[in-house]
Amino acid sequence: MASEAHTRTALIGRWFAWLDRARIAWVAVGDDHAIAAGAGNDVDLLVAPRQLAAIPRLIRRFARANRLRLVQDIQHEAVARFFVLAWEDDDGRPGFLYLDIAGDYWRHGRRFVPVAPVLQRRVRASALGAGGERITYWRPAPADNLLYYLLKKIDKGSLPDAACATLARDWRRDPAGARQALVGYLPSAAVELVAIAVITGRWQPVQRVLPALRDRLATATRLGPPAVAAESMRRVLRCCRPTGLVVQVDESSEADEVARDWAKAFRRVVVVRTDRPPGLLCRLLLIWPQVMATTLVVFASSAATVPGAVRLAASARLRNRALGLHLARRHAMGGGGRYLSLTV
């Protein structure tokens, strides 16, 4: 039986080849070592903006060709979509592949990194996957990858050891280019902190200034009317097409198993153990906001039916299959919305 990491890296290699056959201009950004290892991280891709509209259709075709289920399609930015593809292993448990695909790199309605120069400087690279297979992909120039990855970590407010190693590796490949890339986004003092951290291996000073850098980035770019309109439309669509789900099982142990197996397909999981169905006010004020925030709400209740919940069987294999099919049907018609075109 192939491990989940082995299956994931094989699928990543096929997806990259699928993009090339479709003549999509793309690049894989971030920690390419983790991608090749099938570590379960998001596969972050930047795509030529004019080709973004073709991506959802390609995803669905790829899923059908590889017997996968598209279980999440989340538009987390006006020009960025997060897809989760699922498969079933020999034990009936789900495995997941995460694809985060965007045009220009946007966060909170602001454009951080335009993708056109990144695609112009991309290079072909390869790495060995978890099962020994060779994965070929497009990689950004070192300075471009460092800029993208550092901005993403600043925005998240977290810089773990693996991320520090990736940043140091890219800086050493092109020190002058890395310094020049950061100067346009970070204060000179912060750029020097990164340069010193690469040499010394001590990233604590950089980690301490992450909150200040995050605040600076959040206010550095003014939102023009097109960006405001696109961000507003995205928020409306997220409310109309919630990406969370409410399910119900009979036993508390079954709820824990559902939470364990499907946590990676949602942003959060909440388990509710009760013998009384939630009232209308509870559903509107407590449950519905969770569902809009991509939360899986699992009710363990055999005494009453939870309104609007998907009832799952007692068998783990049947539970996982039914939940996967339900999510796949929800996205079969491309219900996650469209990439929005921005002119800024």
Q: Which stretches of residues belong to each language-model region?
A:
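Flexible, charged surface loops at secondary-structure boundaries
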Residues: 19-21, 39, 93, 239-241, ...
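Conserved beta-strand segments of alpha/beta enzyme cores
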Residues: 25, 270, 338-340
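A short acidic (Asp/Glu
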Residues: 37-41, 256-257, 307
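NTP-dependent small-molecule kinase module
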Residues: 210-238, 307-344
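Structural motif
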Residues: 49-50, 102-104, 248-252, 273-277, ...
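Conserved nucleotide-sensing/catalytic segment adjacent to the nucleotide-binding pocket
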Residues: 267-310
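Conserved NTP-donor binding/palm subdomain of two-metal-ion nucleotidyltransferases/polymerases, i.e.
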Residues: 1-41, 47-245
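Glycine-rich phosphate-binding P-loop
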Residues: 245-264
